[in-house]
């Protein structure tokens, strides 16, 4: 689920069953693995690779 207020780059790769909360930003050249959770207001700048089943808080 991607919250409607989240901003996700078209150049980002998002895995399956990923939750991206309100007001998150996922930048270019970011890969988020399956099952990850980004709580509200998380910003991920590239180049970044995130493995499976991680949880991020602001």
Regions from the PLM with identified roles:
Residues 1-5:
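Short, basic phosphate-binding NTP loop
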Residues 6, 12, 17-20, 24, ...:
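A structural motif detector for beta-strand N-caps
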